[in-house]
UniProtKB/Swiss-Prot annotation:
Subcellular localization, as worded in the UniProt entry: Cell membrane
PROSITE patterns with a match to the protein in the record: PROKAR_LIPOPROTEIN (PS51257)
S-diacylglycerol cysteine lipid sites: 18
Membrane topology: Lipid-anchor
Name this polypeptide is given: Efem/EfeO family lipoprotein
Residues spanning the membrane: none
UniProt keywords, alphabetically: Cell membrane, Lipoprotein, Membrane, Palmitate, Signal
Entry annotated with the keyword Ribosomal protein: no
Signal peptide: 1-17
Entry's family note: Belongs to the EfeM/EfeO family.
Lipidation (N-palmitoyl cysteine): 18
GO cellular component assignments: plasma membrane
Amino acid sequence: MKKLTTLLLASTLLIAACGNDDSKKDDSKTSKKDDGVKAELKQATKAYDKYTDEQLNEFLKGTEKFVKAIENNDMAQAKALYPKVRMYYERSEPVAEAFGDLDPKIDARLADMKEEKKEKEWSGYHKIEKALYEDKKIDDVTKKDAQQLLKDAKELHAKADTLDITPKLMLQGSVDLLNEVATSKITGEEEIYSHTDLYDFKANIEGAQKIYDLFKPILEKKDKKLSDDIQMNFDKVNQLLDKYKDNNGGYESFEKVSKKDRKAFADAVNALGEPLSKMAVITE
């Protein structure tokens, strides 16, 4: 009987040991899988960091040309550069939170500054936009504002390498930006003097889509249907924007966009934002 008991105990321990080995193997597989996802997220974030660096580099180059046009009193050249240069900044806007105080210095609207009772501190592209498109003049104040803009653009460019960009910021930033496009930018409030809003919209969509493209391989492993839904909605938004392309590779004035199309665009961006907000599943 003692031998039988000993034999049964040995068998139980052997089975338990085998079970523990299987559990360890499963844990090991899960750990390796998690490590793989973390590595992919890190790689995608690094790639977006590089993309942001490139956009801010081009933004600085464009701003230098823009400021030179202001210094030369070249109104036509300044207006031609204005929307195109701003696109580099707008593509980076999903992570503008990381820009700190430089974001309002470069991109604040007068309405926002008035709301905060800081209109005397107003600076940046939109202040110069008002001078070019509403006041229709370049004076000493405009030139001073242009020099300050260039200084801020240089500071942002220098800061690019130290920006704290994370997957969470990228994902949340892209969703928040699309929400802003659909609810407030769609009214024309961003480019209230120049009506070059469609350039901004296109750049905002491109910035958000870059984030999706970089995370797409990870998302497809987690939820292929969600990934396909996001891609389909990006395509719909871009098709609506394409309707208002001009013959020079740019976009028509936002004033030419019908109320029907404005609503269609807002609805399309909202429809895109809904599945895009679920993309955080890749970090789980």
